[in-house]
Amino acid sequence: MMVSRRELFGLAAGAALQAPRLAGQEGQRPVFRVKVDMVVLAFTVTDSKNHYINGLKPPDFRIYEDGILQKLNTFAEGTKPPLLIADDGTARPLVDAQGSGTAPEGGPVGLDRPDAFIGTNVFVLFDTSNFMYRGFVYAEDAIADFVRGLDRADSVAVYTFSRNLSRAAVLTRDHNDAINGLRRSVAGDDTALYNALLLTLRDAAKVPGRKVVIVFSNGPDNASMVAPDDVRAVAEDEGITIYTISTNEVTKDTISNSALRRIAQRTGGKAYSARTWQKQVEAFESIREDLGNSYTITYYPAANPNEGFRKIAVEIVSDPGKKFRVHTRPGYRPSRSL
């Protein structure tokens, strides 16, 4: 059964959340497949001292999939306006000074909303379960400070979850509106972290441009019907970077913290352990720095017979000594089952 990527998330999320009803139907798990069109690749570049390398241009990069050189489609650094890369390698603004798109009418899918490629679409997923009860108010303050500090080009959504997901504030460039939604959140009971994360990824997948999900949680999950690695694979294939902030002690719940760390690393994000308000603020500051010092490249994959996992490699042509380090996802599956 072939379905679109958007249809997959609706079906997959529905199937995941209704799993208990299907307990007696062994061997009847539906399989849905998705196909990747335009690839959005976000990454940071650092030196040996972990300092960000800024100012690199499109000719400085070569992107490979399974060793096959890819043609760049668009290029952006931080919150600067994205550039459209022509066949001859020249670049021009994707969006003009008035905010109008310069992509040709009838052009490639994904460029029909050029303004969506300005800034980052940030989804904050906030754990409001009983595991977070003691630090609830402090966590709210740390998230609110983070949202206030985002670049005005960034869009932000605030989702909360315990057993169920609540869209406290849908994606908006009005950061005050997002904070107001956050302040209306209430504490819940059990924790279905991976159910909530899958639903958040479904929403993020509908939005063009660069997407980031920040998971703020105590870590344990006692109510989800989907596995962490399944959710991680969806984010990896969609090109959605995930950052995780755990308020739990690493040594107290090694399984949960290990799962969160793996999700972050495999999607090009970072994992933080932050029990105190100060550590939480520092984690958010680190994430904000990552967003402001990142590069985002899009491309349409060249012909490749590999329908399994495709390895992505980013080469910096202007760094022949290989002194720089690229932080990004290791690859994706152009067509996968869930």
Q: Language-model features: where?
A:
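N-terminal secretory signal peptides and thylakoid transit peptides that target proteins
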Residues: 1-14
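Scaffold/interface architecture of coatomer-like assemblies
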Residues: 23-338
